[in-house]
Each structure stands twice: as structure tokens, then as C-alpha cells.
Regions:
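Primarily marks secretory-pathway-exposed extracellular/lumenal segments that are disulfide-
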Residues: 1-50
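Activation on beta-sandwich/Ig-like modules and their edge loops
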Residues: 44-168
Length: 168
């Protein structure tokens, strides 16, 4: 249907229809009807931001258990990552809790860390260490374990982990 000489009454393909596009099945702009490659291959690679550390059960000597919980993100790429609209989730008891949506303009430099703290006390405690600190808007971490997920602004999972309190 995308060819210039498309004939809806045709009953066989005589090879005269040329549909220019991408023939690489791994590309975002792949078109299964393409008959001629136009070298427009388009790939999308998610930034390499990982959930690097989860501090889910701080010692009570620090104060309230929830105050000092955090998760640490790390950009393992060699370029800065734009985290605008990214979302961090934690799942406890089968319920997915939205913990943070990153504001527009949030970036994480190559090789840099970022801390997502559960409370204002955590933001204060971890904020002076030379990296960005954000306060999560809901939830805290389960001491017995749960699933954590970092998703891009379109809901694609960038990184996800499961942790538990059992010995390895």
C-alpha cells in the first residue's frame, strides 16, 4: 500500500512494487513490507543506569529505621544520562508503589552516583557527600526483600533487581 504504483486489484506480486525503508528486524523503524533498504536504520539504546546499592535495613543506632533507607543509582555509561520523567518503583507484598518521578532536566553524569532517600532525614544525612540526593515520594523498603525497578519516561525497564534478607 505504500508503493507509488500500488494496485489494489493485483492478484500476484510481479516485483514491480518498491517500498523503501528499513529491513533490519532489530531496528525501531523496521518495516516488514520493505523491499528496498534505504539505510535509515534507527536503534534506541537505554542509558546504562543501574540500581547499584539498596540500604533497606539500617541499624537502629542511626535512629528510625525508615529515616536512613536509600537506594543508590550509578551511571555506568561514558556519557551523561537524561533521567527526565524516569520512574523508580518498589514492589512490596505484590503492590507496585511509585516512589519517585524524576523532574525534567535531571541528569546523571557518566560514572556518577545518585541517592534516592526515603525521608527528609536521609536527604539531609546523605546530601553533603557530593552527589545528587532525591527524596522518594511514597513507600519505604521491605526488610525482608522486594522487587525494585527503574523505568524510563515511556515505561521501559532500564534496570530491575530483587533483593531479600536471606543469606546467599
Amino acid at each position: 500500500e505504500g508503493a507509488d504504483n500500488y494496485d489494489p486489484t493485483a492478484t500476484i506480486d510481479d516485483g514491480s512494487c518498491v517500498i523503501v525503508g528499513c529491513t533490519d528486524v532489530t531496528a525501531l523503524n523496521y518495516n516488514e513490507n520493505t523491499t528496498q533498504e534505504d539505510n535509515s536504520t534507527c536503534y534506541y539504546t537505554l542509558p546504562s543506569v543501574i540500581i547499584n546499592e539498596v540500604h533497606y535495613n539500617p541499624c537502629t543506632a542511626q535512629g528510625d529505621d525508615f529515616d536512613f533507607e536509600f537506594v543508590e543509582l550509578l551511571n555506568i555509561d561514558d556519557v551523561a544520562a537524561d533521567l527526565s520523567g524516569y520512574q523508580f518503583y518498589n514492589e512490596s507484598g505484590g503492590l507496585l508503589q511509585l516512589s519517585l518521578v524524576f523532574p525534567d532536566g535531571t541528569t546523571l553524569a557518566a560514572g556518577e552516583f545518585m541517592v534516592l532517600a526515603v525521608s527528609e532525614a536521609g536527604v539531609t544525612a546523605y546530601g553533603g557527600n557530593g552527589y545528587q540526593v532525591f527524596q522518594m515520594t511514597a513507600g519505604n523498603f521491605s526488610n525482608s526483600g522486594e522487587a525494585l525497578s527503574l523505568q524510563d519516561a515511556f515505561g521501559n525497564v532500564v534496570n530491575a533487581i530483587d533483593y531479600d534478607d536471606a543469606s546467599p
